């Protein structure tokens, strides 16, 4: 019996040690788990911040390229009325040949400078395209003049690369 009591006491002490050991192990695991979770959280934040920085750099690069590509847009819009006036002046009757030749040279040099900057005249013949043309008047269409074709150009249109500076103002058969 004394042996049984000693065995029971030893078993109780061993059970208490096992419970204490298990309790000691659990906090260590939870601290390790917490540290791993925090490390994962910091890594996730780092990856997000890195991706955001790359996006900011990419957007800044694209914006810089667009500014460079369309830098002459405002100047071209300011020059286009002068180019229109030169064209009207060349159409006036009674000018001497020397004056017409001088006006034509100025017009050609302006057109050349605009082309070097990527500015092109919008084609205003054939079919009407609402992306490039502005209908300011319509005429009835017939067999000779199909519907949605351009009858006359009142003012030339221009574009800078893929951006419309000014649509061509046209008369359209309807």
From Swiss-Prot:
UniProt KW Nucleotide-binding keyword: no
Record keywords: Chaperone, Cytoplasm, Stress response
Compartments it resides in: Cytoplasm
Biased composition (Basic and acidic residues): 26-35
The organism's place on the tree of life at top rank: Bacteria
Main subcellular localisation: cytoplasm
Disordered: annotated span: 1-35
One Pfam short name: GrpE
PANTHER family in the record: GRPE PROTEIN, GRPE PROTEIN HOMOLOG, MITOCHONDRIAL
Entry similarity comment: Belongs to the GrpE family.
Main function: Participates actively in the response to hyperosmotic and heat shock by preventing the aggregation of stress-denatured proteins, in association with DnaK and GrpE. It is the nucleotide exchange factor for DnaK and may function as a thermosensor. Unfolded proteins bind initially to DnaJ; upon interaction with the DnaJ-bound protein, DnaK hydrolyzes its bound ATP, resulting in the formation of a stable complex. GrpE releases ADP from DnaK; ATP binding to DnaK triggers the release of the substrate protein, thus completing the reaction cycle.
Name the UniProt record assigns to this protein: Protein GrpE
Organism this protein belongs to: Streptococcus pneumoniae serotype 2 (strain D39 / NCTC 7466)
């Amino acid at each position: 019996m004394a042996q049984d009591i000693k065995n029971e006491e030893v078993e109780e002490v061993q059970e208490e040690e096992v419970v204490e050991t298990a309790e000691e192990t659990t906090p260590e695991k939870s601290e390790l788990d917490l540290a791993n979770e925090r490390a994962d959280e910091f890594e996730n934040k780092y990856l997000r911040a890195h991706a955001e920085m790359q996006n900011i750099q990419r957007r800044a690069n694209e914006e810089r390229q667009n500014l460079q590509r369309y830098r002459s847009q405002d100047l071209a819009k300011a020059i286009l009325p002068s180019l229109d006036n030169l064209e009207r002046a060349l159409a006036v009757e009674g000018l001497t040949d020397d004056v017409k030749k001088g006006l034509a040279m100025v017009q050609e040099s302006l057109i050349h400078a605009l082309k070097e900057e990527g500015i092109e005249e919008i084609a205003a013949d054939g079919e009407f395209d609402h992306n490039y043309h502005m209908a300011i008047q319509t005429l009835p269409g017939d067999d000779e003049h199909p519907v949605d074709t351009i009858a006359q150009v009142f003012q030339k249109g221009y574009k800078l690369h893929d951006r419309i500076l000014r649509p061509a103002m046209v008369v359209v058969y309807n």
